[in-house]
Amino acid sequence: MKRDGGRLLPRERMIKAGPESLSVEELVAIVLRTGKKGKHVLELSKDLLERFDGSLIKLSNASLEEIASVEGVGMVKAITLKAALELGKRLHRELERIPEKLDSSVKVYKYCQEMVYLEREIVKVICLDTKLNVIGENTLTVGTSDRSLIHPRDVFRTAIRANASGVIVVHNHPSGDPTPSKEDRLITERLKQAGEILGVSLVDHVIVSRRGYFSFREEGEL
């Protein structure tokens, strides 16, 4: 990216002033690298962001196909962009979670913030030591838009492999309402019973959503 009418373009600005000096539009333009015939890469970046309401969260949650469908983007640019966004997510996890002690449901909710905006249900098993420090985690299932599947066998296989003393099971409600369903309550009871048999404590089952969370432990249901 060269100078445009005397103005420093994104790559030059990053070299001179660092990445924090760039707007989101400019950062996305660097990832896209090139525009298309008749459209500068900064214009393409603007079009792409506008397609997802200017929200990095919506852009991050979009599928490759949805991103690639923006005129001028295509699959190659979409793949590069998704990879960059995923690296950002993983960096956030490293910065915010390690080390981490999950001794309250509020901390669990903050720990799993990336789950609350997903459009599909996922189930995460967080493995803990005796002091409630995180020693591992695993995403078990990706459900449909309105249900997920949690099987005690899979939950405690993860716990045993991590040599965990306890586990916290977390899943999201894409609807935005964290209120547990009848199925959620049933699986919580099954997980509790299985944990008692195996000697691995079910520390909590937490449902997270955009409007908050529900903790079975906090509500006295565990």
From Swiss-Prot:
Superkingdom per UniProt: Bacteria
Position of sequence motif JAMM motif: 171-184
GO molecular function: metal ion binding; metallopeptidase activity
Chain positions recorded as Zn(2+) binding sites: 171, 173, 184
Chain ranges of the MPN domain: 101-222
A Pfam family the protein falls into: RadC
InterPro entries: MPN (IPR037518), RadC_JAB (IPR025657), RuvA_2-like (IPR010994), UPF0758 (IPR001405), UPF0758_CS (IPR020891), UPF0758_N (IPR046778)
Protein name in the entry: UPF0758 protein TM_1557
Organism, as annotated: Thermotoga maritima (strain ATCC 43589 / DSM 3109 / JCM 10099 / NBRC 100826 / MSB8)
Lineage, uppermost ranks: Bacteria, Thermotogati, Thermotogota, Thermotogae, Thermotogales
